[in-house]
């Protein structure tokens, strides 16, 4: 079978049309609504306690102390971030939280605990919650985990709907399968990237204007890096949905299979690791195993994660295209 080379002008035209069509389609609107609700809800849940702490400070001392607020965020966020990054286990985080609970004063144990915490403050955690705006870092970590579950609402129906109603036969009179396949993938990626930009910009603007605990330039710079991490991460998951959508005839089945594939890999790896430790490596079947590295301080790590995203994208995209070229429409 001959895999045909896409025509750049056709791919560009189809991608621009598809990205605009996504905004008018039911799938695009559902994705936009779910993504906005999820992203802004995460931000609200994390920012609200900070606002309450600021209000409490204002009542008690007549003003807010940004330095004290930032320190409180770091103290609370450190074990959580270390758990999310896989640096510490849940048991270790629980023990540290218990050690911080009020109790009888013990200078020896307190000093030992302080030394232990300082020694365990790894460079990655230090980068995320000390060198960068900690609140925004935690929001980004949650979005990196949650957005792959949301992206399938946008990307599930790139091809399958037109296969079901045989609409592609009319399009193929004017263009090639390769142009349709890659154009729709690119259009979906463009729409997803725009939505990520809206979410990150809204959260950053609100955090900066409402709390004023971080310098504006620090927030803006970290927001750009977080946006790039989210935008890059969505691309391989969109490619997975492209593969599934090109392989089945039903949009509903495509959505179900996309959900099962994305969530199933994570679930099987986590549950399987309790019985057999090597099961955790199943996470690397999808970007789950390394996606947090997109926020790593070392260039080798975040660049490696970005290149891995492109490699996963190329693999799933070409697998889907091979299937799409061979199948009967």
Predicted feature locations:
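Transmembrane helix-loop junction
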Residues: 21, 161, 173, 204, ...
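Secretory targeting signals
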Residues: 41-71, 106, 110-157, 181-252, ...
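Helix-loop-helix units of permease transmembrane domains in multi-pass membrane transporters
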Residues: 158-190
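Aromatic- and glycine-rich beta-strand/loop motifs that create alpha-glucan
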Residues: 1-35
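Hydrophobic alpha-helical membrane-insertion segments
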Residues: 31-47, 188-198, 257-273
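Alpha-helical transmembrane segments of multipass membrane proteins
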Residues: 18, 201-205, 239-243, 263, ...
């Amino acid at each position: 079978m001959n895999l045909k080379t896409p025509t750049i002008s056709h791919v560009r035209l189809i991608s621009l049309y598809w990205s605009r069509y996504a905004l008018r389609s039911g799938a695009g609107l559902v994705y936009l609504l779910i993504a906005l609700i999820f992203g802004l809800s995460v931000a609200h849940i994390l920012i609200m306690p900070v606002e309450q702490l600021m209000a409490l400070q204002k009542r008690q001392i007549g003003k807010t102390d940004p330095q004290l607020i930032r320190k409180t965020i770091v103290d609370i966020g450190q074990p959580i971030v270390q758990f999310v990054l896989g640096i510490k286990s849940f048991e270790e985080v629980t023990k540290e939280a218990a050690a911080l609970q009020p109790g009888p004063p013990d200078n020896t144990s307190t000093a030992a605990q302080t030394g232990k915490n300082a020694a365990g403050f790894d460079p990655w955690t230090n980068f995320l919650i000390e060198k960068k705006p900690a609140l925004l870092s935690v929001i980004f970590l949650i979005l990196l985990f949650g957005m792959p579950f949301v992206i399938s609402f946008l990307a599930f129906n790139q091809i399958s709907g037109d296969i079901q109603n045989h609409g592609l036969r009319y399009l193929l009179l004017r263009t090639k399968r390769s142009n349709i396949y890659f154009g729709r993938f690119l259009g979906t990626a463009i729409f997803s990237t725009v939505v990520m930009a809206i979410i990150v910009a809204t959260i950053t603007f609100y955090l900066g204007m409402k709390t004023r605990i971080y310098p504006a330039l620090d927030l803006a710079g970290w927001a750009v890096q977080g946006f790039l991490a989210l935008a890059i991460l969505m691309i391989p998951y969109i490619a997975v949905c492209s593969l599934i959508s090109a392989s089945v005839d039903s949009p509903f089945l495509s959505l179900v299979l996309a959900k099962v594939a994305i969530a199933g890999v994570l679930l099987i790896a986590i549950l399987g690791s309790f019985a057999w430790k090597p099961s955790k490596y199943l996470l690397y079947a999808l970007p789950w195993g390394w996606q947090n590295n997109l926020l790593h301080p070392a260039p080798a790590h975040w660049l490696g994660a970005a290149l891995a995203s492109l490699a996963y994208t190329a693999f799933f995209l070409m697998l889907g295209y091979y299937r799409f070229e061979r199948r009967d429409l």
